[in-house]
């Protein structure tokens, strides 16, 4: 018996030593491989490791949290790290969280770490292999194909549409002078109309599905957030069995049905044109995005599914992210009457009729541009950008194992006091040329950066600038919502639980 007990003790001891040794390389209770340093120094000397609430790493930290709780959890992790990047240990893969511009630069500039992280897989059924998610040759080919669709001359041709939609928006405000308006209800219609009529070439007002599409986008994000709040829901089989899969399928049918209708309508128009011809100067004509895709299809460079993926990507990117930016910018202007008045004075140098304002004149609105940039800094539409290591990679002195997740926290990078003193204050003048000297080139990245930056960023800024100019010239904005009353939520884009309200008063001319 004593021999058996001794044998058992030795076996348990050997097993314990084995597990202890393995635990140096693998976080056994989290079922993931550990991040280590390239020079063999202690991990804590280069990065903060966020302690989990249980022995199972951070796996149970997010379980059944709300989107607002997740937003708070991220901010708390950033605060605990105290200016350092930090590590979470999740099921099967650690997550490297970057909050420093200097370290984000290496990821942004990398041509190897371009695959999106796991959270984007929850969006793939919606967007497919569009520019946001696609990688390697498919991404390179489509990026090259679509870049001319956002050339200066194309943007200039969109200007008249932005102006026309802005006039329609002003008419809505004229009918509601003195009332508190929920920006979340009126801004999305404006931005969706713009993206459809410009990049896609289809008037949304002619299509009754517009409201249904907007609601479907809202419902999709609710399901997305539910899956983000339960790690098991990341697995499609689990979501199919225990999630609201039927509702999810109906939402996707609505979204894809709407975008397919736009493509079909544009395809009919396309057949009546001779796209791809040369102009009177012998140069190949440039076309808006959907025309460009249809021309590429005619040349065998993209198939129908590829067109659908890109249209879904651009509709979402050009509609939802721009809506978010406009909503926050209008609120910030309402909260800061002095900044609003400075922009109003700047606009007095423009022709009274907005139709006569040129692209050059819009580009010369320095104070308004500073306001837009400061709003994007405080409230970036996409607060996090994600990547996945498809192989073991060395980054910023760390060895990241295969499948490690990388999150670049745009929200926190742009609130780094080293680059933006008084980071939580709204100070548009910080973006004046004389105040931007020597700022780190990756400290302000609301549109991402590097080769995979947002292809439509100039489109979005011009759209925002045209509407803001029209609104400020015609109305005084008064706040009906305070920033401290808002509860922020983590999601596909930055959200608040509350609708944001602003009161518009007609200016005396």
Swiss-Prot record:
It is an enzyme of class 1 (oxidoreductase). CDD domains: CYP4. The keyword Membrane applies. Heme binds at residue 454. Signal peptide: none annotated. The keyword Chaperone does not apply. GO terms for molecular function: heme binding; iron ion binding; monooxygenase activity; oxidoreductase activity, acting on paired donors, with incorporation or reduction of molecular oxygen. It is a peripheral membrane protein. GO terms for cellular component: endoplasmic reticulum membrane. Its cofactor is heme. Its EC number is 1.14.-.-. Keywords: Endoplasmic reticulum, Heme, Iron, Membrane, Metal-binding, Microsome, Monooxygenase, Oxidoreductase. It is found in: Endoplasmic reticulum membrane; Microsome membrane. Belongs to the cytochrome P450 family. May be involved in the metabolism of insect hormones and in the breakdown of synthetic insecticides. PANTHER family: CYTOCHROME P450 4P1-RELATED, CYTOCHROME P450 FAMILY 4. This is Probable cytochrome P450 4ac3. It comes from Drosophila melanogaster.
